[in-house]
């Protein structure tokens, strides 16, 4: 079976500074895959490598087996990859509906049926479709950002720390939204600092340290891994607390 997304020995960084040192990972159909690691591990950089936001010095990025290494972001979007960055991921002065319409900018068909599906997936947005997106709660703004990306019916959705800065209540809501999106059949690659909650919903996970692969396993196995617990989860088995 061909992986939806594959990074194979990817190296690269910003300017003269190399951050990724030969990392490899895969996302299979219908999976949620989580990348965790300490600050500076290269988690977000790995995601930007997929989306064409930095020049790679080595390795390959493949979508459905086809090479997309070092392609421009607009090319990557048209091929079915949508990326929700951690910040500045909505148009705050536009309404919720206008944000979703912006998400459909590369579609050349009638996007209204898809918008109806997005409102069904995110009921709070349907209630506030005319409201300026910047006036919503942090959790609802993240829903707008994800809904905007989902307007393109992507082959894979990339989420960079979707719960960053949110209260525990809103974090829980966003993880539920991630599961709901995945339940529609959309594979998800997610970078997340809230390792325990992320691994609880993940099919598989990758631990990056200093721009290199450290551990990869199922979400459940990583939760029970003592090394992972010591590094990111406060010591002891993650699922014991």
Q: Which residues does each PLM region occupy?
A:
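Glycine-rich phosphate-binding loops of nucleotide-dependent enzymes
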Residues: 2-241
């Amino acid at each position: 079976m061909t992986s939806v997304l594959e990074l194979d020995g990817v190296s690269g960084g910003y300017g003269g500074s190399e951050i990724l040192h030969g990392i490899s990972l895969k996302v299979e159909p219908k999976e949620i895959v989580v990348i965790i690691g300490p600050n500076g591990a290269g988690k977000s950089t790995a995601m930007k490598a997929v989306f064409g936001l930095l020049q790679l010095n080595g390795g390959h990025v493949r979508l459905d087996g086809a090479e997309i290494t070092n392609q421009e972001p607009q090319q990557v979007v048209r091929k079915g990859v949508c990326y929700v960055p951690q910040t500045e991921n909505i148009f705050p002065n536009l309404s919720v509906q206008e944000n979703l319409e912006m998400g459909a900018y590369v579609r050349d068909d009638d996007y209204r049926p898809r918008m109806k599906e997005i409102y069904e997936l995110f009921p709070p947005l349907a209630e506030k479709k005319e409201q300026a997106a910047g006036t919503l709660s942090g959790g609802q703004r993240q829903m707008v950002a994800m809904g905007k990306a989902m307007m393109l019916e992507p082959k894979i959705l990339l989420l960079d720390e979707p719960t960053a800065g949110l209260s525990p209540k809103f974090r829980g809501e966003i993880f539920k939204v991630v599961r709901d999106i995945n339940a529609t059949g959309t594979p998800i690659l997610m970078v997340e600092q809230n390792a325990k909650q992320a691994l609880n919903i993940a099919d598989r996970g990758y631990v990056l340290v200093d721009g290199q692969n450290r551990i990869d396993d199922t979400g459940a196995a990583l939760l029970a891994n003592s090394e992972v617990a010591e590094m990111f989860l406060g010591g002891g088995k993650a699922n014991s607390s």
